[in-house]
C-alpha cells in the first residue's frame, strides 16, 4: 500500500503538468478554448497498477462543463488530443518508433499542416509512421509508401511499396 500511495501522489503531480502542457500544445491546433484535467479517483481496492482510477476530462468550448473525453470530444478533437498525448509521451520515453494511424481524422487545411509539423519534429528524434490521406501531413514525410489491395484468384492481398519521387508529387 505504501508504494501505491507514492504512485498516487506522483500521478497527482504529473497530471497537473501534463494537463497544462497538453493545453499549450493543442491551442495552436485550432482549439483555443480547450480545458483539460486529469481526475485521479481512489479505488476501493488496490490493483496491480495502483489504487487510482484515472479519467481525462475535457471541454473544447468556453461554456461547456468538463466531461470525460469519450463522451464529449468529436473525431477531430480526439485526433488532436491523441497527437498531443503521443508527442508528450515521446518526449519522456525513448521510443524508437511512433505510429499515427489516421490521427488526422476530422481535420484539414491549416490544422492538418500544424499537426504535420508536430509529427515532423518527432521524426527528428525517432521513426514516425503516419497513415494519412491528407497532403498536408504526407508532404512532411521523408519517405512515402503506397498501401494497396490486390485480388488474386483465391483472396485479396494487402501490399506495400515505396513510392519514387515522381509518385510522391502526384
Indicate where each model-derived feature is located.
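Walker B catalytic acidic pair
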Residues: 101-102
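Conserved D-loop-proximal element of ABC-family nucleotide-binding domains
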Residues: 92-93, 105-113
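Flexible glycine-/small-residue-rich
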Residues: 38-42, 58-62, 85-87, 148-149, ...
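C-terminal lobe/lid and adjacent interdomain/linker elements of RecA-like ASCE P-loop ATPase modules
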Residues: 110-170
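GG-anchored amphipathic helix commonly corresponding to the ABC/SMC/Rad50 NBD signature/C-loop
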Residues: 60-63, 76-98, 122
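Charged, surface-exposed helical/loop "interaction arms" that form contiguous linear patches used
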Residues: 1-45
Amino acid at each position: 500500500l505504501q508504494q501505491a500511495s507514492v504512485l498516487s501522489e506522483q500521478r497527482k503531480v504529473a497530471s497537473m503538468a501534463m494537463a497544462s502542457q497538453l493545453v499549450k500544445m493543442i491551442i495552436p491546433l485550432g482549439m483555443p478554448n480547450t480545458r483539460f484535467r486529469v481526475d485521479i479517483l481512489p479505488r476501493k481496492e488496490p490493483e496491480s497498477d495502483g489504487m487510482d482510477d484515472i479519467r481525462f476530462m475535457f471541454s473544447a468550448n468556453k461554456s461547456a462543463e468538463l466531461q470525460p473525453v469519450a463522451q464529449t470530444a468529436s473525431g477531430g478533437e480526439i485526433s488532436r488530443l491523441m497527437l498531443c498525448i503521443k508527442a508528450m509521451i515521446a518526449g519522456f520515453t525513448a521510443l524508437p518508433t511512433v505510429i499515427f494511424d489516421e490521427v488526422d481524422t476530422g481535420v484539414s487545411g491549416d490544422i492538418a499542416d500544424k499537426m504535420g509539423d508536430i509529427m515532423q519534429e518527432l521524426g527528428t528524434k525517432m521513426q514516425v509512421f503516419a497513415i494519412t490521406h491528407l497532403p498536408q501531413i504526407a508532404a512532411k514525410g521523408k519517405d512515402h509508401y503506397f498501401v494497396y489491395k490486390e485480388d488474386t484468384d483465391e483472396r485479396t492481398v494487402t501490399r506495400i511499396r515505396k513510392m519514387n519521387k515522381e509518385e510522391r508529387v502526384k
